[in-house]
């Protein structure tokens, strides 16, 4: 393994809100970006292969529909891939898993270091309080496309993992009817310009505990993405998480 101390960084989704912040944080390490509209003066292309050939690592904060094409292009180029896009269907996730056989891929629903530790606490709470009702509330800006958020689903998966059960068997996004024992419920709110709020509530008849995270500035995600990119470049092929990057 030969780590790269100053990797050349590309950004897929560079003209979006988070992509723009990632570009600012990357500074002189930025070599170009990927968007739906090319801008040669800014080294922005519409071709993922053209971007990847000039990069050591690409931070991908684009759209779920682009993931299969990006997976193929980045794997072919041998370019490390930091993937923060959420709302993937099974076909897109299969493409990510296949790419990780050839290149290092760090996949995260949320790049916040504090939220990464939140997930570990969620696992511990799930394991330690297996009979408590688990509910997850998430609030985001009105433009967000997926609900529940990828981060909320990651929290639910962490609780299920702590309890040693299949997330798919216990996730409850349909709120009609009596609450099943062992279910993990979700509630989503959309409005205004809220960056991101997540609460995990575990409830029993005589007590409850709430674990909360509030993102106050979207730049925390950009800084986390850059941390992940610099950690990932030069790693062996495989599928990594933000928790791996924080062990640096």
Curated annotation (Swiss-Prot):
Per its UniProt record, what Gene3D superfamilies does this chain match? Dihydrodipicolinate Reductase, domain 2, NAD(P)-binding Rossmann-like Domain
Which EC numbers characterise this protein's activity in its record? 1.17.1.8
Q: Name one GO cellular component term.
A: cytosol
* Residues annotated for NADP(+) binding in this entry: 36
Instruction: Spell out the catalytic residues.
Output: 140, 144
Q: Which positions does UniProt annotate for (S)-2,3,4,5-tetrahydrodipicolinate binding?
A: 141, 150-151
Write down the chemical reaction(s) this protein catalyses: (S)-2,3,4,5-tetrahydrodipicolinate + NAD(+) + H2O = (2S,4S)-4-hydroxy-2,3,4,5-tetrahydrodipicolinate + NADH + H(+); (S)-2,3,4,5-tetrahydrodipicolinate + NADP(+) + H2O = (2S,4S)-4-hydroxy-2,3,4,5-tetrahydrodipicolinate + NADPH + H(+)
User: Main subcellular localization, coarse class?
Assistant: cytoplasm
InterPro entries recorded: DapB_C, DapB_N, DapB_N_CS, DHDPR_bac, NAD(P)-bd_dom_sf
Query: EC top class, in one word?
Result: oxidoreductase
User: Where does this protein reside within or beyond the cell?
Assistant: Cytoplasm
Q: Which GO terms describe its molecular function?
A: 4-hydroxy-tetrahydrodipicolinate reductase; NAD binding; NADP binding; oxidoreductase activity, acting on CH or CH2 groups, NAD or NADP as acceptor
Alphabetically sorted, this entry's keywords are:
Amino-acid biosynthesis, Cytoplasm, Diaminopimelate biosynthesis, Lysine biosynthesis, NAD, NADP, Oxidoreductase
Q: Name one GO biological process term.
A: lysine biosynthetic process via diaminopimelate
Pathway it acts in? Amino-acid biosynthesis; L-lysine biosynthesis via DAP pathway; (S)-tetrahydrodipicolinate from L-aspartate: step 4/4
Q: Where does NAD(+) bind?
A: 13-18, 84-86, 108-111
> This protein's superkingdom?
Bacteria
The cross-references to NCBIfam families, in alphabetical order and at most eight, read: dapB (TIGR00036)
For this chain, the family text in UniProt reads: Belongs to the DapB family.
Question: What function does this protein fulfil?
Answer: Catalyzes the conversion of 4-hydroxy-tetrahydrodipicolinate (HTPA) to tetrahydrodipicolinate.
Q: Which HAMAP family match?
A: DapB
Q: What is this protein called?
A: 4-hydroxy-tetrahydrodipicolinate reductase
Lineage of the native species? Answer: Bacteria, Pseudomonadati, Pseudomonadota, Alphaproteobacteria, Acetobacterales
Name the gene: dapB
